[in-house]
Amino acid sequence: MFTYEEEQRIQELCTMAFDYARKNDLQNLKIMIEAGLSANLKNHKGDSLLMLASYHNSYDCAKFLLENGANVDEKNDKGQTPLAGVCFKGYLPMCKLLVEYGANIDENNGLGMTPFTFAVMFGRTDVVEFLSQNSKKSFLKKISLFLLKIFKRNKN
């Protein structure tokens, strides 16, 4: 058991780690992970360090976390994966990184939404194109290419 003061200090350190992940402060996040903090640490909303790094486009921190065992498909309390957040935001390099580390392109959030769905909904055509090229589902490839043509036609 920890004392109240120890619990408070642990909470402060965890909050600092989440801030480092958001702000791409690799130097300080690295110190904490190397000192024993879990690369899969989650906050009160179920967001992992990787979720926050990915969502805030903190590429260096995301890569470091993945290299140190972060679960690439860890869902938050809303059922979202880091890849879903990245597809919503439209961060193609981050999307590529997560897929390189095995992110499931077709992961369902429990409401029928996938990372691909978010990319399509928010018009992230470069992300849609990348995901369609990397999906194992032939139907997804066909429909995504069709949707890409529509998006490109509507932009012109």
Regions found by a protein language model. Name each.
Residues 12-31:
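Alpha-helical segment of the N-proximal tetratricopeptide repeat
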Residues 25-33, 58-66, 91-99, 124-132:
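Ankyrin repeat structural motif
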Residues 1-16, 101, 120-156:
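Ankyrin-repeat-protein effector appendages
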Residues 19-24, 52-58, 85-91, 118-124:
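Ankyrin repeat A-helix N-terminal signature
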